[in-house]
Amino acid sequence: VYKNWYDQEIPTHMVKHIDKKIVLWQAMISQKQQRELDSLFKTEEDLHILIMNVEALSTQKGVDFAKKFLFSHRALMAVDESTTIKNPDAKRTKSICDLGLASRYNRILTGSPVTKSPLDLYKQCEFLQPELLGFSSYYAFRARFAKLKTMNYGGKSFQLVTGYKNLDELAEIIKPFSERILKKECLDLPPKTYIKRTIQLSTEQQKLYTQMKRMAIAELHGKTMTTATALVQLMRLQQITCGHFKADDGSVKQIKNNRISELLSVLDEVEGKAIIWCHWRHDIQNVVAAITKEYGPRSVVTYYG
C-alpha cells in the first residue's frame, strides 16, 4: 500500500506547481537511500514527503527516524489503512499514536474503520487526538459501548465481549470529525479495484535471491540449491521470494519472510470469507498454520491437488 503512494497516488493527485521531494523508506538502507533520507533535513522551499510502511514503525530504527522527521517539520501525519492501528495492545499502535503527538496535523484513511468491532475505533481516533471520543482509556470506552461478561479460565477471570450497545451515540460522536465518501461519489472507477501489495524481501531472502540470480547456486544452513537451465533458475527464484528453499536433496527449508504477516494484515481488514491462492504446496501449509494460530482450527480449509 505505502509504495503505491510513491509510484502512483502522489504523482497523480498532487498539483504540479508545488515543488516537492518524496522519499520512500526502505528496510535495507543503501548509501544512496541514506543520502535521500538525509536530504529531507535540508533547509529549502520544497515540500518534504516521507513515505513509510507501518511495519517500519514496529522497529526502533523506523520510529527514531519518523520522530526526527516530525520534530524537524511542521508536519501532517497520515495513516493509510488505519485499521492497522486498531489493536490497543500492539507495539506498532502505541508507537504510531506516540508519533502522532509530535505532528501538527493528523489524518487517517481507510475503506472501513470498523472491520470486526466498533471498539476498533478507539485507537484510530486517539491517533487523531487524545480523548477525541471523550474517554481517557480504552477500557472506559469499551465499558460504554460493549456488552461484557465476566468469564473464568485457568483460575483467572477476564471480560468477554458478547455484543455492543449505544452505537447510535457512538455514531453521533464520530460524525463531526469524519467524512465518508462512496466510490461512486468521487471517482469514475471500475466495478472492482485491484490493489497490489509490495512486500520487501527479508535480509536472508535478498542474500539467497542474489546468489541464485548471479551464480545459479544458493546455500542455506549447509544445504545447496543449484539449477541447470534458465527456466529452473526462474522457478527457484520464485520459491525464494515465496519464503522457502528447496535443496537439491529434496529437503525444504523455511526462509524468514514478510508474506505471512502481510497476509494476516489483509485478512484483518476484510469482512467475511476470503479466497487465498498459493503457488506452492509449502505456501499452503504455511498459510494454514498462520491462520489456524490466529483464528482457530476451524477458520480455514484447503483445496488443492
Regions found by a protein language model. Name each.
Residues 104-118:
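Conserved helicase ATPase motor motifs in RecA-like P-loop NTPase domains
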Residues 80-81:
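Walker B catalytic acidic pair
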Residues 32-50:
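Conserved motor-coupling elements within RecA-like helicase/translocase cores
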Residues 105-106, 121-137:
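A short helix-turn-beta junction within AAA+ P-loop NTPase domains corresponding to the substrate/partner-engaging
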Residues 277-305:
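Conserved helicase motor "Helicase C" RecA-like lobe of SF1/SF2 P-loop NTPases
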Residues 2-30, 128-132, 293-297:
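Conserved helix-turn-beta segment of the N-terminal RecA-like "Helicase ATP-binding" lobe
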Residues 1-11, 115-120, 279-284:
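Conserved Walker A/P-loop ATP-binding site and its immediately adjacent core
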Residues 51-57, 63-71, 90-104, 134-252, ...:
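Inter-lobe coupling linker of SF2 helicases/translocases
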